[in-house]
Amino acid sequence: VKAYKFELVEILWADAATEHGWEDSESLDDAEEIAVTVGFPVKESNLHLWLASTYDSSAQHNARIKIPKGMIRKRTVLKKAKVA
C-alpha cells in the first residue's frame, strides 16, 4: 500500500475573467466563471489554499496554485491521505 502524505482534492472556484471589444453595460454577463482545479493541498491559511500538482517522497512539492478561499465554491476530497 502506497503512502499519501496529502489528500487529493477537486476545487471549484470562481475565476476572474476578462472581456474585450465595445459593449454597453446592459450586455455584460454577471455569471461566475467557474474553474476546476485538482491537486494536493500543501498549505492552507485563513485567506488561501495552496494546491500542488506533484510531490515527492520527502514531501517537497512543485507546480503550485494559490487560490483565495473567498473564491472557492466547492471542495471535494477525491483520495484521502494515507500514512505509511
Features from the language model and the residues they span:
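Conserved RNA-binding domains used in RNP assembly and mRNA/RNA metabolism
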Residues: 1-84
